[in-house]
């Protein structure tokens, strides 16, 4: 029983030392489950390299935040926790080579691009520009920069410059980049001049590439046309030589018979009529001349051989 009395007489101890009977007991604030899940996801990502489990843990943390938001959000949860969950999730998706899903995965929790944290948006720009797909974030970043609430953030100027260098200039949107730099008060005078100089350099390079491509196309076009005109006589000559050689390879009587049949079919004249005798006589003379030319040509070739 002494132990019971001594226990009851002992002062209660709290975080700040022994409590007096007149002092109220201070309740320790409950830690949000999302914070524990965030630490678990970071551990899975960095230490265990289990990217799929890290992504699933981030999604469970977001679900926990959504459930607590229905009632009263416990102390300890903040925008930094949500931003950190997005950072871990983006890195996990990138490690699994699912970087195309990053933007849609983030927007399912923030609903609209204007609500994205600057750090998350910067990470998206860096990822998609590194994968040479800056056009995927063009509309999202543009909507974020046009939102009046975001223009008062301290990160606005750096993010706008990052957007110009990583998205607009690689895509060739030089007019949009110049309009953003000139119309934004977030750029200092020195930074504005530097970015405008970069835009001017990109525009000159674009003009040189365009003029160079046009000059390269002209010789190719002229060369192709001249090649066609030069190759056309050669093709006709080859066809003519092939037809003549094929014609000479036929016997003379067969050639004459084929010509007569062709005349009967095409010209439709009667060989027995007196008016056709002159034509047949001329045709026979033509065949004799062709035959002499063929034999004389073969004779010359034999002499040369």
UniProtKB/Swiss-Prot annotation:
Pfam families: Pex26 (PF07163). Widely expressed. Highly expressed in kidney, liver, brain and skeletal muscles. Expressed at intermediate level in pancreas, placenta and heart. Weakly expressed in lung. Belongs to the peroxin-26 family. It comes from Homo sapiens. It is found in: Peroxisome membrane. The lineage of its organism: Eukaryota, Metazoa, Chordata, Craniata, Vertebrata. This is Peroxisome assembly protein 26. InterPro entries: Pex26 (IPR010797). The chain crosses the membrane at residues 247-267. Interacts (via its cytoplasmic domain) with PEX6; interaction is direct and is ATP-dependent. Interacts with PEX1; interaction is indirect and is mediated via interaction with PEX6. Peroxisomal docking factor that anchors PEX1 and PEX6 to peroxisome membranes. PEX26 is therefore required for the formation of the PEX1-PEX6 AAA ATPase complex, a complex that mediates the extraction of the PEX5 receptor from peroxisomal membrane. GO terms for biological process: protein import into peroxisome matrix; protein import into peroxisome membrane; protein to membrane docking. Residues 1-20 are annotated as: Disordered. GO terms for cellular component: cytosol; peroxisomal membrane; peroxisome. It comes from the Eukaryota. Changing residue 98 to W: In PBD7B and PBD-CG8; neonatal adrenoleukodystrophy; impaired protein import into peroxisome; affects the interaction with PEX6. Residues 1-246 are cytoplasmic. One of its GO terms (molecular function) is protein-containing complex binding.
């Amino acid at each position: 029983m002494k132990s019971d009395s001594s226990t009851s007489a002992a002062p209660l101890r709290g975080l700040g030392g022994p409590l007096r009977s007149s002092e109220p007991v201070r309740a320790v604030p409950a830690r949000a489950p999302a914070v524990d899940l965030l630490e678990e996801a970071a551990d899975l990502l960095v230490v265990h390299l289990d990217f799929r489990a890290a992504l699933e843990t981030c999604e469970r943390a977001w679900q926990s935040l959504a459930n607590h938001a229905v009632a009263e959000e416990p102390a300890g949860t903040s925008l930094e926790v949500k931003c950190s969950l997005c950072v871990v999730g983006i890195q996990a998706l990138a490690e699994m080579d699912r970087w195309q899903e990053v933007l849609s995965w983030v927007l399912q929790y923030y609903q609209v691009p204007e609500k994205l944290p600057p750090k998350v948006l910067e990470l998206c720009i860096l990822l998609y520009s590194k994968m040479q797909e800056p056009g995927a974030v063009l509309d999202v970043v543009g909507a974020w920069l046009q939102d009046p609430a975001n223009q008062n953030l301290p990160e606005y100027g750096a993010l706008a410059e990052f957007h110009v260098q990583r998205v607009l200039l690689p895509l060739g949107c030089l007019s949009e980049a110049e309009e953003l730099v000139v119309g934004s008060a977030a750029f200092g005078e020195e930074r504005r001049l530097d970015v405008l100089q970069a835009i001017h350099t990109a525009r000159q390079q674009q003009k040189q590439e365009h003029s160079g491509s046009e000059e390269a196309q002209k010789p190719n076009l002229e060369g192709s046309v001249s090649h066609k005109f030069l190759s056309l006589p050669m093709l006709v000559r080859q066809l003519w030589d092939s037809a003549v050689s094929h014609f000479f390879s036929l016997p003379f009587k067969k050639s004459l018979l084929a010509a007569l049949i062709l005349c009967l079919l095409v010209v439709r004249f009667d060989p027995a009529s007196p008016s056709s005798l002159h034509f047949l006589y001329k045709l026979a003379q033509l065949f004799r001349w062709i035959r002499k030319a063929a034999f004389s040509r073969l004779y010359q070739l034999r002499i040369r051989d």
